[in-house]
Every structure is written in C-alpha cells, then in structure tokens.
C-alpha cells in the first residue's frame, strides 16, 4: 500500500463517505456495543455523540489551550523539555528543517495522579497555574476516564493529553500519515476541519461535529484483537487561513505491561499475528523504525 501517492486529495465522490457515529444515549447497551465493534472492525475510528461530557467543560478546556499557544515564544519555551530529559511532556515547537510535522504541541500526563509533573504546566495564562485550569483538567480527566471505561474498560491505563496547534499555512500536511502507539485516542477539535483517515486506498475527511468525541483505535488494541480491530491510519491537513487545534487524549498501557493477541481471540484456525511485547519495547521499536524511514 503506497500511501504517499494520494497525499493531497481523494476523489470528491469519496469525500462524502461518513465516519461512523455512535450515539451513547441509545438505551440499548447491546446496540451501542455492536456499533462500536462494527466501527472498530471496518474503520478503526468513530465519533461519539451524547457521551455525557459537558459542552461547557470542553469549551473551557479549549479556550485555555488556545490562550497558551497565543503567548510569546519565550513564555511557551519556559515549559520546554530539557535537552537531557527522557520525559515526553512539555512544549514542543515545529522543526522548519525537518518539515515532517507542522504543528506546535503541549503534552501533559493527566492520569494516574502519580504521573503528573507540574514542572511542565505553564505559568501563563493565569488559568493554567491557578486552581481554575487544574480543576477543569481534573474534571475533564474524570469524564474521559469514565467514558473510556464505558467503551473498552481499561481502568489500569495511563492517560496523556496532547494539545496540537496548527497555524494557518499553505503547507498541505500538518501531521503526516501515522497510526497511534497507544490503545486508543479520544480527540476533540476546534471548528476548523483537517483530520483525515485512510480507507479503501483513499483519504476521507472526518466531519466536524460540535462537542463530539472522535475515537481512534491505536496499535495496542489492534494487536490485542489480533488484527480484528483496525489501527486507523490518519493525518492532519493544514488550513491556509485558519488555525486548527486538536486535543487528543492518548490511552496507553503501563510501560511494563506485556501486550499481545488475547488468547480468547486466537486458536488453531486463527494463530497469533503479532509478537507479545511490553508497551515500552513496542514504542522503542516503532520509534526506531520511524527514524529509519
């Protein structure tokens, strides 16, 4: 599969194909579960509506994130990861020399509490360092963890928030095509579209739905399901006039947890397709492969 050949646009007739939408207000848990399974098998992505996360909470979280990226560079760089640090947290700016990704981003561990490092929380805007932002983040985390457990379980997972900032640009690609290392990602965005997914040899736009949560299946759930659920290939497209932002929450196994095909999903007629590895080893191998490519 040569993804690069179709990096810019799919035929207009295909762009109208809709990403699955799952309505969590449906009183039938069986129907909701069926919809999640079907979307995960066929697409590896779906949009959740009526998910229970208050729209006002999502708005407040986005407002504070936008304010941070509008600060002077010196303010943002005050929470940059030190050069000798192994942390994945902090502010990261785009590298004009590499041009593989055209976004700035800010990363926070948000769950469990023992993983949170406030050294990477900005002092400005004031809502970031005060009780306001922390309370909003805690409330949002509670909602997201509850939502994740409702969809797939995973009470022992780790949660990482990544805020992506794509300023207006004539560049076509904001983030190149990739699948996520994690188990799954729960993403919200501002009103500027740009997320695309690859299916049936074409790229499809993900429709913006106000207050929806986009769920993307990652590598670990794909491996645990022995390939039954797709780890969706996706990318981000820039807008020439408007700033696009997104707030994915990455749901990850603990670093030392061994992840591989579940025994109940394998057998003589369906042998394991993937090697069982600790999540840490998997991430290391994938990073090495990405760097080589």
Swiss-Prot record:
The lineage of its organism: Eukaryota, Viridiplantae, Streptophyta, Embryophyta, Tracheophyta. One of its GO terms (molecular function) is metal ion binding. Its cofactor is Fe(2+). Pathway: Secondary metabolite biosynthesis; flavonoid biosynthesis. Its EC number is 1.14.20.6. Belongs to the iron/ascorbate-dependent oxidoreductase family. 2-oxoglutarate binds at residues 164-166, 244-246. This is Probable flavonol synthase 6. Pfam families: 2OG-FeII_Oxy, DIOX_N. It is an enzyme of class 1 (oxidoreductase). PANTHER family: 2-OXOGLUTARATE (2OG) AND FE(II)-DEPENDENT OXYGENASE SUPERFAMILY PROTEIN-RELATED (PTHR47990). It comes from Arabidopsis thaliana (Mouse-ear cress). Binds 1 Fe(2+) ion per subunit.
